[in-house]
Amino acid sequence: MNKADRLNQLLPNGRGVWIPIDHGASDFPIPGLTDTEGVIKSLVAAGVDGIVAQKGVVSHYQHLCEGSRTSMVIHFSVSTRHAGPDAANKVIVGHADEVIPRGGVGVSCQVNMGSPNEAAMIERMGQLSREALHHELPMFGMVLSLIHI
């Protein structure tokens, strides 16, 4: 499967419904996300196109998506609420070459605009994007603003 096929799988006809469940690495337990297997089974049954999750979740639960229209995207950015003033600094915890062996079809990472570490996060996103290019993987960015207008 090439990049275009993977992208079409995630965004049939250029559109898709994705659900991020990547929060467990940052802050667990979160109400509604404590039964990971049950959540994923529900999302697959609902016919979502993509589930965005941390790499361990994808490795452990990707088999639940087999034979369905649902694919998994590995979110490689992590920080925790316990990091205090550095909690918004998302670091990359893997590489694009892990995606296919773990059962994913794309990569995702996050940049928090307005964070003191914004430039470093953008640089990390660029490095992951380069890896995704070389592995024929779609790359998705979660770009959030920490600036309240």
Label each region the model flagged.
Residues 131-145:
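Hydrophobic, aromatic-enriched interface-forming segments
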Residues 20-61:
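N-terminal low-complexity or amphipathic/hydrophobic leaders
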Residues 19, 99, 142:
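Conserved, mostly hydrophobic/aromatic
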Residues 44, 126-134:
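Anion (oxyanion) recognition and catalysis
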Residues 147-149:
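Conserved small/polar residues in nucleotide/adenosyl-binding loops
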Residues 46-122, 138:
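Active-site beta->alpha loop and helix N-cap motifs at the rims of alpha/beta catalytic domains
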Residues 1-22, 62-69:
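N-terminal amphipathic alpha-helix/helix-capping segment at the start of soluble metabolic enzymes
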